[in-house]
Amino acid sequence: MYMLTILQLEAYRATGDKKYLDRDALEMTSYLDKLQQPNGLFYHAPDVPFFWGRGDGWVAAGMAEILRDLPADHPQRMRIMKGYKTMMASLLKYQGKDGMWRELIDHEEAWPESSSSAMFTFAMMTGAKNGWLDASTNGPSARKGWIAVAGYIDQNSNLTSVCEGTGKKNDLEYYLERKRITGDFHGHAAVLWAASALLR
């Protein structure tokens, strides 16, 4: 819900050709209709019922990005906004007291994961600043997320506690035991997105 949709969105941004934006919106709504769970989150795979942090982070970032460009009267905007708001409401519930989200979002025993936390912060901050979300609720949550994620940047400007690349597996322990990486680009990019949303 990010890797394909962002290509269409960037093609639209580069060319101004609306067909790319329409394709992006159609792809996103198709994914939402098929994959979003009742709690607003997304399984790592249809046959793997775990809400892996960075997997959901891509979805959150993808929806926030397209909503920035999609006109108010676009036929798919309401559907995407509904999916986005449902996801953001769920993420509010699962944010830890430390401001972070867990490597498995709905498992308190999972470790705080920085790349997904930065992605969620980006998506939530974008919504609060654009008036899509209640700023009095989501603004403080996004700010808390940013402060928390910034605390995971080490003295060499590397983000710590980034989950290693993770394929699907229907095994809880497999996810809970994923390695924590320092300096992975999945984390760097997400932090820059969050910073851009804060400054935008």
Please tell me what each predicted stretch does.
Residues M3, R23, W58, G83-T86, ...:
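Charged catalytic carboxylate motif
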